[in-house]
């Protein structure tokens, strides 16, 4: 029995013939009659660079789907404009020399030539692209663009045209991502273009990372995939790279200079979702930290340096002197941008570890006596005065972030032929250390000056006879005596609040009825009294009564 007869009996010859015809029919059933394969080569560096990449080689290959032959090609080198000198790494990788790009036209000229080449294909072969396929004749040959990944048309060309204010041709806004199609069809992730060809038994021909050679090999891969039964379709119609502009405004938590912090409640569930670093200082009787708090949550603190100028309304707290973080704005926590910013000044006299964005609040019900040295109070007052005059500047040259997360919008990762690109290392030039300015959200308003001196305060507390503000009286009185909230008409202890509406009384402290106005079952007694009035009564009692009687009354 001859070999030919045995093959006929086994049906090998018929099977081959049927398989070949089936493959041709499956290829011809594709939606597109022509495919244009594009594979750009761009400027690249060994290390990462902040500058964008520019196209230096613009190849295109026209593939006939039915015949599987390459019928036309377009190729041109492109002269880079932003960084015209190629790196040694780029020349070694792509094989493109400096002389080739110097004598090449810029990108806008190459795009014009490429558009003329596309028009010639439309006239000669009746090629129709997706942009004008709606009004095309029934006999028109539909054509699509194919790239190995979304990087060529979705990242490289798009970003460069935006930087140079060039318009992308409408036909190049729709393409087929062959790598994504390969992964879905064969259910495996390819290891680059060469690896995808080797997995299918096709040898990569030519020099790798040469634009025209890569386009030809990509055409071979597309033809093989269609032969295996893969139906090519547009993977990213009118897809744009999601370019998110860097916010040039203040973060949401730092937009208003005088922020109204409302409904600050003393509950344990308030700060469970905050991203800020909270330091719990428990059972400490005297806290004298020079770090000015990393947004500190102080529990059971008997003595803490606290400003009374914080913008608060409806502060709800218990008598345990628990400190809560004033980071609730309209009932929601804005902890994303409450980063602690450190003062980077090269000063040997002032040692400030960090400056808090929000000041720590201590329960205002009880003001305990404090025995501090005059030097410590002056140092702390100078530090807080420096913090209150600064504002947040997102364009500052060298911000110093500490104990916070700097959220940066990152571009969706894409590949440039599976090669890590970057910038060449540059020589480090010595420069003077930058001086960072710390920022603060809240600015302490100027103190309200009284019309005349308070001589009783001068004699009793040892102060100089000069016009003093209400805050100065409060601070002086807090160092000597305990001040108890007055009783309202309801018979309850009045609540101590601070005006935060930015008006003429901004920063002043007052007392009101502790009952909520929103409660319909109970009615408030409309009790209201400025703290300055309470202090005046207390000071007058200090001068008219004996020290023992005044001390008994204040308690």
Swiss-Prot record:
Chain segments carrying region Disordered: 266-319
Binding site for Mg(2+) 1: 39, 41, 214
UniProt superkingdom: Eukaryota
Skewed-composition ranges (Polar residues): 290-299
Start-end of GRF-type zinc fingers: 488-534
Keywords, in A-Z order: Exonuclease, Hydrolase, Magnesium, Metal-binding, Nuclease, Zinc, Zinc-finger
All residue ranges annotated as the Exonuclease domain in the record: 35-222
Binding site for Zn(2+): 488, 490, 513, 525
Active site: 41 (proton acceptor), 209 (proton acceptor)
Family: Belongs to the ERI2 family.
Protein name per the record: ERI1 exoribonuclease 2
Gene, per the UniProt record: eri2
């Amino acid at each position: 029995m001859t070999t030919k007869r045995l093959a006929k009996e086994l049906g090998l010859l018929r099977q081959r013939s049927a398989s070949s015809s089936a493959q041709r029919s499956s290829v011809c059933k594709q939606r597109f009659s022509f495919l244009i394969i594009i594979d750009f080569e761009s400027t690249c560096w060994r290390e990462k660079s902040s500058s964008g990449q520019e196209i230096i080689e613009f190849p295109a290959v026209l593939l006939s789907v039915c015949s599987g032959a390459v019928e036309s090609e377009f190729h041109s080198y492109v002269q880079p404009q932003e960084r015209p000198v190629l790196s040694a790494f780029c020349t070694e990788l792509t094989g493109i020399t400096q002389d080739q790009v110097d004598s090449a036209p810029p990108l806008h000229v190459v795009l014009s030539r490429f558009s003329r080449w596309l028009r010639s294909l439309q006239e000669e072969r009746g090629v129709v692209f997706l942009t004008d396929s709606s009004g095309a004749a029934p006999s028109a040959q539909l054509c699509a663009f194919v790239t190995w990944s979304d990087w060529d048309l979705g990242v490289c060309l798009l970003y460069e045209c935006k930087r140079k204010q060039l318009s992308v041709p409408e036909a190049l806004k729709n393409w087929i991502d062959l790598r994504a199609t390969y992964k879905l069809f064969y259910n495996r992730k390819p290891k680059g273009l060469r690896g995808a060809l080797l997995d299918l038994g096709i040898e990569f021909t030519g020099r790798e990372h040469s634009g025209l050679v890569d386009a030809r090999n990509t055409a071979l891969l597309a033809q093989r995939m269609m032969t295996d039964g893969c139906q090519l379709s547009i993977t990213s119609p009118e897809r744009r790279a999601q370019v998110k502009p860097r916010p040039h405004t203040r973060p949401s938590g730092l937009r208003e200079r005088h922020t109204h912090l409302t409904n600050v409640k003393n509950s344990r569930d308030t700060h469970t979702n905050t991203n800020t670093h909270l330091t719990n200082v428990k059972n400490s009787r005297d806290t004298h930290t020079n770090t000015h708090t990393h947004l500190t949550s102080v529990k059971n603190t008997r003595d803490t340096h606290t400003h009374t100028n914080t913008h608060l309304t409806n502060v709800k707290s218990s008598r345990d002197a628990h400190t809560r973080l004033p980071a609730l704005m309209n009932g929601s926590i804005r902890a994303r941008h409450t980063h602690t910013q450190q003062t980077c000044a090269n000063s040997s006299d002032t040692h400030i570890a960090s400056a808090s964005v929000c000041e720590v609040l201590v329960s205002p019900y009880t003001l305990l006596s404090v025995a501090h040295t005059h030097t410590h109070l002056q140092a702390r007052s100078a530090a807080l005065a420096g913090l209150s005059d600064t504002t947040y500047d997102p364009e500052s040259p060298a911000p110093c972030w500490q104990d916070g997360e700097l959220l940066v919008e990152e571009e969706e990762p894409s590949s440039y032929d599976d090669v890590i690109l970057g910038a060449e290392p540059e020589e480090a030039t010595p420069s003077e250390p930058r001086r960072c300015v710390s920022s603060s959200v809240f600015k302490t308003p100027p103190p309200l000056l009284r019309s005349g001196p308070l001589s009783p305060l001068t004699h009793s507390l040892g102060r100089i006879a000069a016009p003093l503000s209400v805050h100065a009286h409060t601070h002086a009185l807090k160092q000597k005596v305990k001040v108890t909230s007055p009783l309202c008409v309801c018979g309850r202890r009045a609540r101590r609040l601070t005006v935060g509406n930015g008006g003429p009384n901004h920063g002043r402290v007052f007392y009101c009825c502790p009952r909520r106005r929103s409660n319909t079952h109970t009615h408030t007694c409309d009790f209201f009294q400025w703290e300055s009035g309470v202090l005046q009564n207390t000071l007058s009692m200090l001068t008219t009564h004996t020290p023992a009687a005044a001390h008994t009354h204040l308690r």
